[in-house]
Amino acid sequence: MRILVINCHSDNRGDEAAVHAMVDEISVAHPEVEIILAIRGAGTKYPNMPSNVKMIHQFMPISFKAKVAHRIAVLTDGKISISLNERVLISEISKSDIILHAPGGPSIGDTYYSDESTYLAIYDLLIAMHKPYMFYAPSMGPFQREERNSWRKKILEHSEAIVLRDPISEKYVRSIVPNKKVSSTLDSAFQHDVNTEQNQEKLNQYIDLKRFLEKHEKCVGVTITDLQWHPVYSKDPAIAKNVRDIFHEFFSSITKIGYGVVFIPQLYGNANDYDLMCKFCCDTNDYFIVTANDGRYDAYFQQYLIGQLYAVIGMRYHSNIFSAKMGTPFISISYEQKMKGFMEKMDLVEYCIDLQNLSKDVLKNRFEYLVKQYDEYKKFLCNKHTFMKTEAHKTTDILETILEREDTVI
C-alpha cells in the first residue's frame, strides 16, 4: 500500500507532531505501508521519521510559468507536464492508493486567502486523475469571501471523507457543503503516545535543561509569537507591542516568586522563532530556551518535556495540544478557531484567552486561577487522556474504512 500526504507544512513542531502521529498510527495498522510526505516549499524535512517514509518537496503553482504548467497537467489528466517538479508529484499521485490532506491549520479558507489557491489547485489535478483523497483532520474556514466558494465546494464534495479537528471548522464546512458528511475528531497528535523511556534519556543527555528543571521547583513552559507572520494580525503593529509588554511583565512577576520560565520554540529551520524568544529571556538563572534546530529534540521530545513542567502558557496551538495530551495545566491564547474550537470541545474555555482580550490583568488573573484550580485541572486532563487519544484516532479509523472500500472495489 502507498499513501501520499500533500500540503505538509515543515519547520514547525506542531505540524510535525500531527503528521508524525498520523504516520505512526497508519504504520501500526499497515506495517508494509509506504508513506510519501509532500512538503510545501523548500522547508526542512521532518526529523526522525520511520524508514517507510519518504519526503519530497511539493510542487506549488505560484509563478505564471508554474500556473501554465499546472493547467496543462490538469487538462491532460496528468499525462503531460512541462514542470519537472510537477512531474515528480504526478508520479507519486499515480502510484498512490489514496492521497491525504495533511493535518494542519486552516489553509483552505479566508485566513490564508493569498496562498489558498496553491492548495486548492492540487485537488484539481487529483480530480482530473481520478484519484481518491481525504481531508485528514485539518482546520478549515471561514468562507466569507464567497468568490472562491464554488471552487472550495467542488473540491470538498469530490473527497472520500472530510474529517476536521475542531467543531468551529466543522460548522464552517457544513455551511458550504450541507449535503456532504463531515466528521469532527481531535488533533492527530493525540492519537500516538510518547515513548517516555526514550525521551527521558534524551532529557538526561540535555544537561543544561535538566539542571535548570532541577534548580526550579516549578517551571512554566512558554510558546510565544508576535504574529508578524500572520496575514491579518501583522497589519496591526500594536498587537506585537502588546504581546511584548504583557509577557515581559508577566515573566518578571512569576520569576520573582520562584518560577522558572522554559521557552519552547515551535519553529525551526527556515522559520526559526528561537531569536524571538531570546528577546524575552532576561537572564540565564530563571529563563531557559530549548534549542530549536537539533533534530534530537523533536516534537515527541517537546511533548515529553511539557509533561515535566508545572504549567504552560501557549500562544502556539500545538504547545497547548501537547499540554492537554501530557496532562499539564495550560492557558491558551487563541488567535484562530483551531485553538478556540478545541477548548470549547474540551470544556476548557475558562483557560482560553482570546487574543483581542489579552491584557496584563487578564493573563495575571487567569494564571492565578490556574494555580488555585491546579489539582482539579490536572486531574481533569489526565482523566481525559484516553478520550482525547480515541477521538483523534477516529480519523485513522475513517481512513481504514475508505481503504477497505477501495479494496472491495478493486
What residues fall within each predicted segment?
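Active-site anion-handling motifs in enzyme catalytic cores
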Residues: 1-410
